[in-house]
Amino acid sequence: MICSRYDGCIPSLSLLLIAAMLSTPASRNPLHTREITFQGYAREDGLWDIEAHLRDFKFHPFTTGGKTWEPGQAFHDMWVRITVNTELVILAIEVSMDSHPHPECPQVIPPMDGLIGARLGKGWRKTINEHLGGIKGCTHLRELLSNIATAAFQSIPGALFDPDDNKPPLYLGTCKSWDFDGPVVMRVYPKFYKWKPTI
């Protein structure tokens, strides 16, 4: 049971169900939509492709970069595809800017090749910033790249597991549910319940 001065006492499960739904919003008008999708693919050659797609559009006409964009017309429509091996090393990268507000935007595509040979995992965001940070890259492509690693982890079997059975999966200790001292780890990975890294 969880109790509050507003709701009285309710079962914990009920609180979880309540937290999963947003309340009915106030009367409002839509202004902007950003759609981001990630998809993982197993290739026949034993490698994996992870694709990311970002699309921005507004619900009213607006002008930027000397061009007027109509409602629903994407002014950002960008794709990134990386090919990785089992060790999550990037073997190839491809970028497409199907829509962009300024003619200079595609100039950031060639430097993306600098990520070939990098590994998804610890330090990935630092690697992105080293190669594509600031004026060397694109804010929106960096956003896709930052999260493409998560899609890879979800897509590739064993990506989050250390081959050493005496070490916990890499996602343990990264969020509330996977707290080493919490009930989920105690149930699912009792071996690593209360685990502390050795220094």
Regions inferred by a protein language model and the residue ranges of each:
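N-terminal amphipathic/basic-hydrophobic helices that include classical n-h-c signal peptides
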Residues: 1-20
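Active-site- and interface-proximal helix/loop "cap" or "latch" segments in soluble metabolic
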Residues: 54-199
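N-terminal intrinsically disordered, cationic/polar leader segments
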Residues: 24-49, 53-64, 77
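Short N-terminal helix-initiation segments at or just after the protein's N-terminus
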Residues: 18-32, 156-163
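Intrinsically disordered, low-complexity segments enriched in small/polar residues
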Residues: 3-6, 38, 171, 180
